[in-house]
Amino acid sequence: MYKIVRAEELTTNIYLFEVEAKRVAKACLPGQFVIVKMDEKGERIPLTICDYDREAGTITIVFQPVGASTTKMKELKAGDYFRDFTGPLGNASELVEEDIEELKKKKILFVGGGVGAAPVYPQVKWLHEHGVDADVIIGSKTKDMLILEKEMEAVSGNYYPCTDDGSYGHAGMVTTMVEELVEKGNKYDVCIAIGPMIMMKFVCLLTKKLGIPTVVSMNPIMVDGTGMCGACRLHVGDEIKFACVDGPEFDGHLVNFDEAMKRQQMYKTQEGRAMLKLQEGDTHHGGCGQCGGDE
């Protein structure tokens, strides 16, 4: 059992839990994720790690309720327990694998959208702790929907909040902020984009035009987190990948976002899953119990 030591509603319908999970906290790196289960019969829910404290043995997760399980999960309080808290899973961010001295020579840009700010934060924090300060753009619909602002400002080289309605920071989409920074003479060596798939798609279209290599995190399409259900199958160039086992990070300029978004929508219905099985044959390997493909 894994105890929730802190439970907080960051903003409307976005929640933060800090959970005691010493083994995970000891081993995890930025970019990885965990799978949680509330009880023995509960669904497996993949969530990207937002922060970790190795000394305290805790992991911080941030989530937005979108279905029955996460809606039930938001009712948990400090002192409650998760039955399972499995991780760390997936591959760590490419940045943490690079030589620190080489990283210090690079100008790095992060672009996050909505709850995507949560997986951006541990990467920016890790870089800051190693003497590398990155520029960070975080977008949301309104000021009230921005999360982790104080934390992000503390570890960013420059922090640029954006709101669609212009209520705070830069007025407009994150892509217009990227353009503005480049027009001011910023020459970025790499961009890391994490957020809704439609946001990542348009960031990648822009950065490809600007000649900025871009990494995206495809965690939004994960369902069971083991590769068994096939929900996170996607084309990266000419190759078929699974976000939960091969990623979650990929070259954003090679990801087929239109296909990934279409598959994400189809997996929400039994008819859609049946069509995918007909089209792709062995996409679903059975046994995950999450996507309905065993029915």
Tell what function each PLM region has:
Residues 1-80:
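Ferredoxin-reductase
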Residues 1-30, 39-41, 96-107, 129, ...:
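Iron-sulfur (Fe-S) cluster-binding modules
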Residues 6, 51, 161-163, 216, ...:
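Structural signal for conserved beta-strand scaffold positions within catalytic alpha/beta enzyme cores
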Residues 36, 84-85, 234:
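A generic structural signal for residues embedded in beta-strands
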Residues 39, 87-88, 237:
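Short, surface-exposed secondary-structure boundary micro-motifs
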Residues 42-51, 89-100, 244:
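Short, Lys/Arg- and Gly-enriched loop/turn segments at beta-strand edges
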Residues 71-223:
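FNR/FR-type flavoprotein reductase catalytic core
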Residues 119, 197-198, 220-249, 283-295:
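Local cysteine-cluster metal-coordination motifs and their immediate loop/turn environment
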